[in-house]
Regions:
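Mid-length scaffold segments of soluble, non-membrane domains
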Residues: 107-110, 114-143, 147
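Solvent-exposed coil/turn segments that connect beta secondary-structure elements
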Residues: 102-105, 128-130, 168, 193-195
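Extracellular/periplasmic catalytic domains that process cell-envelope and extracellular macromolecules
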Residues: 91-92, 115-120, 156-157, 181-184
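Catalytic cores and adjacent binding grooves of peptidoglycan-active enzymes
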Residues: 24, 134-195
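Soluble periplasmic/extracytoplasmic beta-strand elements of cell-envelope proteins
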Residues: 98-100, 122-126, 189-191
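Hydrophobic h-region of N-terminal signal peptides that target proteins for export
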Residues: 5-18
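Active-site acidic/histidine clusters and adjacent loop/turn architecture
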Residues: 33-99, 150, 154
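Extended, low-complexity, intrinsically disordered C-terminal regulatory tails
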Residues: 23-32, 79-113, 162-178
Length: 195
């Protein structure tokens, strides 16, 4: 992780004025129950944006995502930051990664929009766009598939246990991990294992 952070700082300095990532208040989290019926203890809040990512509110259709929708298990928040950091280092011309909802501060029911996301182990990651705009794609034809596949591969390598992708994205991975699910043509749903 230190190597990744050092490289990110060097890359940020090479691309103009330094942009500091906001401080994350790390603590050990506990995810209880199931993704569709659970809670989160000592969640960690993902910052609204950073050097390598920004957040998107799928209800208000704007950036950043509200703070109440950006809580996750510490392992999930760390994974997101590491994956998008390494992705950005390998794809420096790519736009920042668009991160959607995680969970609520204490987990629990997360309506509208989500049947899961209740115990801090789920995150929505929007597919990169061909036009490089920093907003979610509206149609699958707008997806930069090589960059999207790169993100899928990185989340698999980082230990994701499930990644739901849309039927029209044509993204691939091991069947036990990457599964096609309707209503996921503009974002992937990444899940990590519970404790």
């Amino acid at each position: 992780m230190l190597r990744t952070l050092t490289a990110l700082v060097a890359l940020a300095l090479a691309h103009g004025p330094p942009a500091a990532d906001p401080v994350v208040h790390w603590r050990h989290s506990t995810s209880l129950g199931r993704p569709d019926h659970g809670s989160l203890v000592n969640g960690v809040q993902l910052p609204a944006e950073g050097i390598t990512f920004f957040t998107w509110d799928p209800v208000l259709l704007r950036s950043p995502d509200r703070g109440s929708r950006r809580w996750g298990n510490d392992r999930l928040v760390r994974m997101v930051q590491e994956v998008v950091g390494e992705y950005w280092l390998e794809n420096p011309d790519a736009p920042r990664v668009c991160i959607g909802d995680l969970s609520r501060r204490h987990g629990g029911d997360f309506q509208p929009k989500h049947a899961s996301h209740q115990n801090g182990l789920d995150v929505d990651v929007y597919y990169p766009r061909l036009d490089r705009r920093e907003r979610p794609p509206i149609r699958p034809a707008q997806i930069d598939r090589p960059l999207a596949q790169d993100l899928v591969n990185r989340f698999i390598a980082a230990g994701a246990t499930r990644i739901f992708v849309g039927p029209n994205t044509h993204l691939k991975g091991p069947r036990r991990i990457v599964q096609v699910l309707v209503l996921h043509d503009n974002h992937m749903h990444v899940r990590i294992a519970g404790p």
